[in-house]
């Protein structure tokens, strides 16, 4: 069976093989009541920054505590970041379509997401909405990371305007990066684009 992936509780960074970690709150409740993790099952705890703790469940919802799960660390893995960094620049969209794009891109392996306030966007982030929107996208990326069993959570960058995005694209290409624009009227398929060799990106 494919192991479940959860966010670890405090102490994960210093955890060693044989240590016991306890998850509480909504993360543990979801694992116990929805995913129904049982004693003896494998669960991976990832911190979103490359640390993966391969664990074995030793207690799940004991004594009626459905918001508590304890696991023993069996293996500690530090997963390196991808050599080629993929960034999704996503225009704000209504009806949650932008969040769906963030979720799908995370599952496909994107390393960062940049929100873009295009001039013709119906959806607009202003004032307090900027922080709320970024937090919502970050939560979406975090959940999608667990769903895809990744060890790295994509970071959600600052909101860009079209002008600042143009500057970002120029800086990216000047430093050897490749920028692909996905457009419904594009004639060239994305599969035909030559990407940089990972060895050249070190």
Predicted regions and their residues:
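Glycine/charged-rich beta-loop-alpha catalytic/anionic-binding loops adjacent to active sites
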Residues: 21-23, 83-87, 199-202
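Surface-exposed, flexible loop/turn segments at secondary-structure boundaries
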Residues: 51, 121, 187
């Amino acid at each position: 069976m494919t192991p479940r992936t959860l966010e670890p509780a405090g102490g994960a960074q210093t955890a060693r093989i044989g240590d016991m970690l306890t998850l509480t709150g909504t993360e543990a409740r979801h694992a116990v009541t929805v995913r129904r993790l049982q004693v003896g099952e494998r669960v991976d705890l990832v911190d979103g920054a490359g640390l993966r703790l391969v664990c074995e469940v030793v207690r799940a919802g004991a004594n009626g505590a459905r918001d508590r799960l304890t696991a023993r660390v069996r293996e500690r893995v530090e997963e390196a970041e991808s050599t080629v960094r993929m960034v999704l620049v996503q225009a704000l969209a209504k009806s949650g379509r932008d969040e769906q794009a963030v979720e799908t891109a995370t599952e496909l392996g994107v390393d960062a997401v940049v929100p873009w306030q295009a001039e013709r966007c119906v959806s607009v982030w202003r004032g307090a909405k900027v922080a709320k929107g970024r937090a919502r996208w970050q939560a979406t990326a975090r959940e999608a990371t667990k769903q895809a069993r990744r060890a790295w959570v994509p970071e959600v960058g600052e909101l860009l305007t079209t002008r600042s995005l143009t500057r970002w694209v120029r800086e990216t290409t000047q430093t050897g990066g490749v920028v692909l624009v996905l457009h419904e009227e594009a004639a060239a398929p994305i599969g035909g684009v030559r990407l940089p060799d990972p060895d050249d990106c070190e």
